[in-house]
Amino acid sequence: MAGLTLERIAVGALKDIHLDVAPGEIVCLSGPSGSGKSRLLRAVSDLEPHGGTARLGGVEQGAVAGHRWRRSVMMVPAESAWWFDSVGEHLHKPMPEALEALGFSDETASWSVSRLSSGEKQRLALVRTLSREPRALLLDEPTANLDETTTRRLEDWLLPLIRKRRLPVLWVAHGGEQIRRLAGRHFRIEGARLVEEPVRT
């Protein structure tokens, strides 16, 4: 698998962002509300105009059509969109093991999206994304609506998958404990730049 490289990314207040994320590495991002965490992920996924570029292995973001780039470098926003009536219609392929690991039943694929809670949508948005076999993940506070037990359950499912598929991951997180559990490296947004913080103290 390929690593993810950010080269001179500029979006909003952020300027000249350089970052290399190795295959299978989780890099956590944190910072105050409004500092640009989500906008940075949107720039990397080519969902927002920006300066600079991103690379996945030897492929440059601007060298392929946006929809093709986003199939490889997939972003899971904090509030996911749903466009079909049922959960199963959103899955690229059946994901029974993932559903079970996250506490869902076999019938979940037939559930109406309208019955889902915010926490269920967050978990199922991750299942939906992984069903499409991306080559890199951009996660915007994917456990924000989950309690501690459910958060740990999601991490226990997702981290081995990241390692197995060797996915480079940018993960926006606020909680210090979660960052210590997940991150290979941690960067905090301060003004226009990323400042590396110690992961474990």
Predicted segments, located by residue:
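Helix-to-loop junction immediately C-terminal to a conserved catalytic motif
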Residues: 45
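ABC ATPase NBD coupling module
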Residues: 60-74
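Q-loop/switch helix immediately C-terminal to the Walker
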Residues: 72, 79-98
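Conserved ABC ATPase signature
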Residues: 112-116, 120
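Hydrophobic anchor residue at the start of the ABC signature
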Residues: 126
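Catalytic Walker B motif of ABC-type/P-loop ATPase nucleotide-binding domains
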Residues: 137-141
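H-loop/switch region of ABC-family ATPase nucleotide-binding domains
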Residues: 172-174
